[in-house]
Amino acid sequence: MASFYVNGQLVTAEKNQKLLRFLRDELRLTSVKDGCSEGACGTCHVLIDGKATKACVPSVDKLEGRHIITVEGLSDTEKEVYAWAFAKVGAVQCGFCIPGMVISAKALLDVNPDPSREEAAFAIRNNICRCTGYKKIIDAILLAAETFRNGGRIPQESDRARVGEAMPRIDAKEKVLGTGKYPDDIYLDGMIYGSAVRSRYPRARVLAIHKEKALALPGVVGVYTADDIPGKVKVGHLMQDWDTMIPVGKITHYLGDAICLVAAETPEILEKAKKLVEVEYEPLKPVFSPTYAAQPFAPQVHESGNLLCEKHVSRGNADQAIRDADYVLMYHYETPYTEHAFLEPECAVAYRDEDGVTILSTDQGTYDTARETSIMLGLPKEKVHVTNMLVGGGFGGKEDMTVQHHAALIAYLSGRPVKVKLTRSESILVHPKRHPMKVTITMGCNNDGLIQGVKAEVTADTGAYASLGGPVLERACTHAAGPYHYDNFEITGRAYYTNNPPAGAFRGFGVTQTCYAMEMTLTKMAHELGISPWEIRYRNAIRPGQTLPNGQIAPPSTGLVETLEAVKDICENNKNMGIACAMKNAGVGVGIPDTGRCIVAVHGGKLHIRSGASCIGQGLGTVLTQIVGTMLHCDREDIVYEAANNVDAPDSGTTSGSRQTLVTGEACRRACQKLLEAAGADVKVSDYTGIANIAELRDLPGENCGDGAVGTELPETVQVDWKKLEGQEFYGEYLAKTDPLGAQDVANPVSHVAYGYATQVCILNDDGTIKEIDAAHFVGKAINPLNCEGQIEGGVAMALGFTLTEHYPLYDCIPSAKYGTLGLFRADKVPTINSILVEKKGQDMACGAIGIGEITTIPTAPAVAGAYFALDGEMRCSLPLMKTPYERPKMPRYWW
């Protein structure tokens, strides 16, 4: 027993436990987040006697008489200032790390009210953020400091919601103050706790599961095996090959496989019960690499074989073009597994309802979760109700189910509400990673530096299950040729199953790996030709009206050249410089139906936005709010963005592929057009394009809403009385039509409805440390410039880790990483990142916007590697890069 003060109140802890658990589970102070419980991430920071301390470290019996402050205990003035400052500068994305950042900021400002930028960065060095790149968090701390020095007075802010303006995010305040709810913040009456007993071996036959001892433990609600599943055992995002649990007699595929599920009244009883479950195995030799998987004598990971898929894309005659070229280069490249390391571990709460089961989730696709769970439960998908809570980061790692179906199954079988949450070590083990890839690329150029032909072979380790391995490989291949204009290329890719952890979606979606190979080879080619790396890219850059290597004609909105021109002076004025270009699709494309859907409803005198699209920190709710505000000339206070769900919000697909701003943004715009028409405005919605014909209200006929580079905003004098439409709903839908990969009957296929383009430059100091990254990104129309900058800064910081420091070591298919050993960049190590937004009109959908969530990570690695090539002349062809000041001792390499 220990007594101490929490937010000024004397409290007594009856049992000894970590302070984090006491604050959350007993006092319900949920601003204190559980990101790792390993003392590594900083999301649980509190003040103990004025010092920022990770609450997962001290036990309560060591805190007698101490004073603890959480965000809930800040003064009203402090709360208002921090909430305003973090929102004002765009420092909030997923938000999971932010309360901990606020505590570290307060610890600094209480002793140093006027810190420097370096001092602010040092103060949050023990707080990890995977979304922002830290720049805007430091901006927020400095703005808060200035505001406190001026008496805490906050200036009056505009309530406008307009496209093109840096409107603060609609969910910023609740995330800063910790009042918003992530699934782990939910505590229901009668709630039990569930978890999986996982495989002891990456590959083994399960001979028997003995659960009697666990069931005999008081407080255990149930132990469930594959035999208890009412529907199908196997689920999967695209391919149903992922076992909900491994049945007795079957073979495990990786260490993260669930053998059985245990449910108990408390987390403590749950952990004891899991240890009492006895599983008999027959260990088998695992498949540890794609090279081994491809051998005819290798064990079969799945009955279908070890080859998940093969992709082949070509145009022209690459072999002949390379033979005829004046210069030919061939290089081999390797990239490793990397971990998403989002701050919020996977968590779901589920309960039975009168119509089926409800899941309160943190994932990237509510409808996908409902569909897969319904297959497992043997229920119609309409009886599985999924609502997305706040999502503490995803980056692709929350596309596949991890805990949602397990929670639903326990709730369905037990009849009790249940919370299933992965520990950080489980999260690192279970969810899919970035694909390791091996790329061999051959490039031919003429004497003028024009690319004549490119060939590439790509090999990927997709791990234990398919996940998104097929589409990732496809995207890696279709983008391997780069954003350049030439007619001859041939790319072959193969993805193999192994008994390693699965690989799936990760920001960049396969393009990050092949772009590294293509761009580094192009940098070397420029060196061989005696021209600058900027010049060779400018000569080859795709321009409007030209054909991309895949045959798609570049539309007028194509903006690669403009991104190159934006960094020309930077390149010319710095010697230790590397540069890389990239393109990335927005939307699924390649012939797959890709639909955005949105409802704008008038309810209670407000405009309600409803869409099944998940907001995972990228700011979709803010984007849709600005589109509605622009179209209907209303302010933020008039608009309510509802949480994504599959009950009363239409299916708008998974949040991936940089698609939601484009497809759901366009659907939202169309819904607004229908509302305008119903209100009596002179608006006609074309069934073919969905573009509003409001010529008399536009400077440019057929252009969309928004000001500046893309069009003109609806005049403020044009008003409609939308409140008279109370009770009505307006449905918008946009179908992005594209041609299938390898379509033979289409001369110029449309692989994707839109592409983003980028050029990034890395400048080194003479000692090899990075001085700055300059990132020029074509965004079409920046619906929210702050959001765009935040995506760029966060994407670059994440990519710097991928390039220089991050690794996910495996030994015989067994990972050994902890959160603190992943090599994530921290605030005091991230270099200056300068965002350059390139706007250009011509793209019709979604007010001219193109999503940039993924492309921000893609060109960083080759830009950095190119800078080191400029520094010492050495080609670095594997990641993370070796022989840099950032290299970590004894960093293991992926074993091919």
Where do the PLM segments sit?
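Helix-loop-helix junctions that connect adjacent transmembrane helices in secondary transporters/permeases
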Residues: 296-377, 540-606, 690, 740-750, ...
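Conserved beta-strand/loop scaffold segments within soluble protein domains that form the structured core
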Residues: 281-284, 369, 388-390, 395-483, ...
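C-terminal catalytic domains of large/alpha subunits in multi-subunit enzymes
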Residues: 226-227, 378-383, 413-418, 447, ...
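Flexible, low-hydrophobicity surface segments
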Residues: 145-307, 328, 413
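Extended active-site and interfacial segments that coordinate phosphate-rich ligands
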Residues: 174, 275-288, 364, 371, ...
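Glycine-rich loop/linker segments at domain edges
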Residues: 90, 165, 171-177, 305-348, ...
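Short beta-strand elements
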Residues: 46, 174, 180, 347-352, ...
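Signature of N-terminal electron-transfer/Fe-S-associated modules in redox systems
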Residues: 1-156, 590
